[in-house]
Amino acid sequence: MISKIKKRLFGFGLYSVACLSLFAQKGGRAATPVYLDENKAIEQRVEDALSRMTLEEKVAMVHAQSNFSSAGCPRLGIPELWMSDGPHGVRAEVLWGNFDWANWTTDSCTAFPALTCLAASFNPDMAYAYGEAIGAEARYRKKDVLLAPGVNIYRSPLNGRNFEYMGEDPYLSATMVVPYIKGVQENGVAACVKHYALNNQEFNRHTTNVQLSDRALYEIYLPAFKAAVQEGGTWSIMGSYNLYQGQHACHNKRLLKDILRDEWGFDGVVVSDWGGVHNTEQAIHNGMDLEFGSWTNGLSAGTRNAYDNYFLAFPYLKLIKEGKVGTKELDEKVSNVLRLIFRTSMDPHKPFGSLGSPEHGQAGREIAEEGIVLLQNNGNVLPIDLNKAKKIAVIGENAIKMMTVGGGSSSLKVKYEISPLDGLKSRVGSKAEVVYARGYVGDPTGEYNGVKTGQDLKDNRSEDELLAEALQVAKDADYVVFFGGLNKSNHQDCEDSDRASLGLPYAQDRVISELAKVNKNLIVVNISGNAVAMPWVNEVPAIVQGWFLGSEAGTALASVLVGDANPSGKLPFTF
């Protein structure tokens, strides 16, 4: 018994000595560990934190723990990372294990113009304002990583996701991405530039094997990513779904190690696109840091937490414990993740952020106004002269349809969205009568992953009936403004599908041509993130490229149409 007591006392003594060793000589306070000392260099903090972590804690840090979060190290007080979709606004909160809306009442955001519109401004100051505002909204919502911006090159006008990118010019994309990143990261939020690399179509995006020359790779498809790393200092990059030279981009040695790390000196985190990892050993050795996915709710894959079955989770741990791989690569991955955490969630000086503020709405409006493009103005039909106009006819579903919901991962739940019709009515006021006719019926749905627009766009009238009403309204108007184009439905401007053709859907060409016959002051406003065919171009005097403009869409379009703002945008891709 005495022997056991001695052993216990000896053990307690060692514990006491260990505890006392953590106390500083000055003032009797506990010494701050290096990794928690904000006065130490980040690399020192990373090294110290890494040295304190167990193998299991390290592996837990390199894969998802929910749809939009990854683990920290609770034992050491290192917080988890939270991410959000957000090319054009911070996405609504979703449930832990799926993408359905979580039904919060505090997650309505400002919707900013699509990045095609930002690129059309050709104004780096607008890119900085965009990044600063969206970064502030992400920070307020306690997001550490904003999964944006997208800089994939506009290679085909049929790519359903072109609206999320910055056009076909590598130089323009490289110029605009840098201030966007700086604006976001000033808020203590990491920009995550995507999709690296060569993800230029949605059709078969998971299986397409891209083959191209090095000259095309370096001169066309990589400049924006290189600028993001070397000039913008982006803290994270998202891998893409496709393959490059037979190897998936999310664990492609040429892209992630040879170019990104060795040539460009990237020191941030490579995040997989959701479900983009396919091979544990390639992910270990070829530069993937943090695996995310969408194939599990975390609960229904047997007795283990299903997230532990990710390629960089339990399978990785098993390989290490069996001695089949070492821990050098793991330490590199965890170091990158720790560096990101110290830059974001553990930065004590990060701002508080703000959400849905008037200033953010104003920034969105200014970006929209600078990005709107005047494609044609024969006979100086524009701007609308409110001193002469008595009646303005507004035609087209896109005059009333909300465009912030839908389109894939960029779908938003907004604080407000001003439609083109409401914006024009508000600006015109009592100076003229504004009369609306629908003209055509597109996609009546108004829901995406549980986020609802609240609009009921069902209309059982035939195409002929809708057209007849539009012509009746238009024939005696002083101006006719047709708001048409694309929307965020599948096979239009939408993730995970490409367009079926270059033409306008819903028989809009017929409506436009018939309107041109009854009124010579016809203005067509094309709302899209893509080029469209315009077989009626010689019939219509005025054409405006209106993009997807976000919360202030209607206000910005009205300002341009009546001449309050100059349509100074330039096309970032070929029409």
Where would I find each of the regions flagged by the language model?
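Bacterial Sec-dependent N-terminal signal peptides
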Residues: M1-A31
